[in-house]
Amino acid sequence: MTRFVFITGGVVSSLGKGIASAALGALLQARGYSVRLRKLDPYLNVDPGTMSPYQHGEVFVTDDGAETDLDLGHYERFTGVHARKSDNATTGRIYSDVIARERRGDYLGATVQVIPHITDAIKDAVTRDLNQDLDFALIEIGGTVGDIESLPFLEAIRQLGNELGPSRTMFVHLTLVPYIPSAGELKTKPTQHSVKELQNVGIQPNMLLCRCDRLIPENERRKIANFCNVRQEAVVSALDVDTIYSVPIRYHEEGMDREVLRHFNLPIGGEPDLTRWREIADVVRAPDGVVKIAIVGKYITLLDSYKSLAEALVHGGIANRVKVEIDWVDSQIFEQADSVQRLEGVHGILVPGGFGERGAEGKIEAVRFAREHKVPFLGICFGMQMAVIEAARNLAGLPDASSTEFGPCEVPIVGLMTEWARGNDLERRSASGDLGGTMRLGSYPAALIEGSLARETYGGVPVVQERHRHRYEVNIHYREQLEAVGLRFSGLSPDGVLPEIVEYADHPWFVGVQYHPELKSKPFDPHPLFSGFVAAAVRQARLV
């Protein structure tokens, strides 16, 4: 029998509902329960795939090829449970499905309305594809209570609470308790008003997570409990912490997991085993050294655009017991003369994914600096493509080498995937048409060449499964020319058609991959490429 915990937010956005949901999932796992986390997003986009990184942050890709909210990355990293397409639903997707059903005549001529048709579709998104033996489904509702676009979602979960009853549903509300320096006290009024807003749509929260920069005194907790109609023990101080990997420990100390079990009349038993959480938090707080890695990107004004990437570097640091200090560098600055000197002193250079011509030449210059100065390098997706173009121009004597993404070119080292096969289904794509649904998405295999750095880094396995998100591929027809100048194609699709990994044998550590390894990295299971990259940076820093 699956129990549902709904997590909502109030007062302001970006309070950390995703981290709170993931931390609760980790605590329940530590007590022996199975969990699955889901996110309902109120925006009208069908998915975040075509949204600007400046608007939404990164797009998290699942094994089954869904482009989802970045919070699903937190869910995976904290619980180790791989997300699926069904774990993220948006208003756009819900409305698209309902309208498609109306066009097919599924509603038999009925007037299609928000209630019951949209709310029924939302309830289906909450409950479908869940294993019958799943203990807990944690459902995060995006947005802030009081937003117009959130109302259908709140109504749907209110109905589920009524239909399933309190024995199977719980409502957790994340709110803000700000400290006002001039008054010298915490203010509870925003929380009171936020809860009232939630009560106005028929939802009584069972627990309050109160974001604050200091512990809430007992008298203030009592006051919040009184005004918001919750148990005092269910008013949890969600304190600011120095690392997100301390959040499960902090919430446990505040009694969050015990209160959830009490609500569902489940045995609390002994203490959960949080040893591994304490161990990684200790490494993050007290590392053996520091390495500096430059991320040369084009969306650095919103760091959420690279959320999984930054976390994967933290994981690589944990594996090597060092702190990774990230130097965020706008790739466009390298399009100016002598600006690559900005990279002197870093112990590693990472060129991440991206789309479009803006900043591409700067990324190519960053690749060249890493190659010529023997600085450890990791290129991801677009970053690998820029590494191949750099080799073609500066080593293979192909100065006109470029990508057709930037326009027609004489030497299309990188080109649009006009067709490719997955299983027995041949899919065709063209440069014209809608952008949505035109990429190679999800998990695909890569065969690793024996004796390569890539295969060694992966522990000697011959084939790996990695997540992809790209429209363009390195042109395999240039393989011979590029390998002749030292750029080895060390990973290919099993049919040998699509280049997946490139590297230099005469470089301390230089790897470019067409996929996104950061999407599979976890604090307790760092991705081998990030462990290896950070280890190379440690050697570069002369720490070992």
From Swiss-Prot:
Q: Where does UTP bind?
A: 13, 187-192, 223
What keyword terms does UniProt attach to this protein?
Answer: ATP-binding, Glutamine amidotransferase, Ligase, Magnesium, Metal-binding, Nucleotide-binding, Pyrimidine biosynthesis
Q: In which pathway does it act?
A: Pyrimidine metabolism; CTP biosynthesis via de novo pathway; CTP from UDP: step 2/2
EC number of this enzyme: 6.3.4.2
Recorded hits in PROSITE patterns, A to Z, give: GATASE_TYPE_1
Kindly list the positions annotated as binding L-glutamine: 54, 354, 382-385, 405, 471
Recorded catalytic activity of this chain's protein: UTP + L-glutamine + ATP + H2O = CTP + L-glutamate + ADP + phosphate + 2 H(+); L-glutamine + H2O = L-glutamate + NH4(+); UTP + NH4(+) + ATP = CTP + ADP + phosphate + 2 H(+)
Q: Where is the active site?
A: 381, 516, 518
Instruction: Give the miscellaneous note.
Output: CTPSs have evolved a hybrid strategy for distinguishing between UTP and CTP. The overlapping regions of the product feedback inhibitory and substrate sites recognize a common feature in both compounds, the triphosphate moiety. To differentiate isosteric substrate and product pyrimidine rings, an additional pocket far from the expected kinase/ligase catalytic site, specifically recognizes the cytosine and ribose portions of the product inhibitor.
Functionally, this protein is described as follows:
Catalyzes the ATP-dependent amination of UTP to CTP with either L-glutamine or ammonia as the source of nitrogen. Regulates intracellular CTP levels through interactions with the four ribonucleotide triphosphates.
Q: Per its record, how is this protein called by name?
A: CTP synthase
Write down the species. Granulibacter bethesdensis (strain ATCC BAA-1260 / CGDNIH1)
Q: Gene name?
A: pyrG
